[in-house]
Amino acid sequence: MSALVFPFQECVEANLWTASPVRILLLKRTPARGGFWQPVSGRVEARDGTFPAAVRREVLEETGFRLAGPLEDLDWSYAFPGRDGRTWRVHAFAAELPRPSPPTLSDEHTEWAWLPPGEALRTLSLPDNRDALRRLLARQSSRGSGPR
């Protein structure tokens, strides 16, 4: 009997930021994984149960940070064709951290950087990641809080 293959692979993206100073965390993937800069991201696993649970797990796995505060659902998702023939659908979230601490990188990444918002937008490799960050920045700016 073969395994079931669903048409979508659900994924999450976590835009981590600090308010003072205003910084955005970006991670650089290993060359084998594309070598590009992006926020924390990964697949939703069956054990997660919810997108927020997947965000918290991925952040812990990729940075060593335990998210204690609330997550912000950016009400933004995007999709792209995966190499496995499925469509990968990414749901974007954000979380504020108290300060720009050095992450403990997983073996998926080679570098990290806490960048000002404008530099983060220029550094992100993928347009969909830039769109998600722009959404966070616009939302926070309209509230008069958070990264600008």
Regions found by a protein language model. Give the residues of each.
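Active-site segment of metal-dependent pyrophosphate-handling enzymes
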Residues: L60, G64-S101
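Conserved Nudix-box catalytic region and its N-terminal flanking loop in Nudix hydrolases
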Residues: V22-E62
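Short, well-ordered beta-strand micro-motif
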Residues: L16, A92-E96, W114
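NUDIX/MutT-family hydrolases
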Residues: P103-L136
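Conserved N-terminal beta-strand and adjoining loop/helix that marks the start
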Residues: M1-L25
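Hydrophobic pocket-lining residues within nucleotide cofactor-binding pockets
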Residues: V44, L67, L97, H109, ...
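Short aromatic/basic micro-patch
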Residues: Q38, T87, W114
